[in-house]
Amino acid sequence: MVDGKKLIKILCFLIGITSCNSIVLTMEKKPYHHLPDGTFRNPEGSPVRSSDIKFSYRTFIKEKKKIDITFPKDHVIDKKIVKENLEKFKNDDYIAWIGHATFLIKLGETTIITDPVFSKNAGPLIFGPDRFTKPALNLDEIPKTHLLLLTHNHYDHQDMGTIRKYPFKNTKVLTPLNLGKYFKKNKIKDVNEMDWYEEIKVNEDLKV
């Protein structure tokens, strides 16, 4: 017979080995761009930002004054024409630029909006860069959307003012990891956080 104390030691040893193996397997399963502290890094081979680059608000203002902002002729389309075109092509596939990174994309029966920003400026409060042109439509004028795509959480892409007032709460939302909470707390329920390289089937005709 095996001594009771020895048996307990053997069992503890085996459990310890199993636990270590589980931890190693868990770590190995994590993608390269996931760091242990829950943050992320760029894929291998990505350009590395120089540590010498520092943000200076004074330099930013100085360089900004050098930029000549001019708009091409007919760059801004009259809102009446925008509405007429959306109505005219409502049964067709189309891409309509609303402003900056905000696009309306219609594919079959699915209407998609990307990075919806309808606020006057990009920032947490009244501060932040102002728009150079107004969006082609107001938020309450866009057609019903079925899918909202958020690329990242910079202020000029994730606009909390727009998210709070977004009229179509049943829209399916796809966001990067850890950003779904901003939509859920504003009563948008169908929120899906996605990692790099992941795919999701939106409906029978569309996979993202």
Model-predicted regions and their roles:
Residues 5-13:
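Sec-dependent signal peptide recognition
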Residues 105, 115, 152, 159, ...:
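Divalent metal-coordination and catalytic microenvironments
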Residues 127-174, 190:
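Active-site metal-binding motif and surrounding structural segment of the metallo-beta-lactamase
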Residues 123-124, 159-161, 184-185:
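Short glycine-/acidic-enriched loop or helix-start segments at secondary-structure transitions
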Residues 97, 155, 194-198:
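Tryptophan-centric aromatic hotspots in well-structured domains and transmembrane helices
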Residues 20-123, 127-128, 133-141, 175-208:
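Metallo-beta-lactamase
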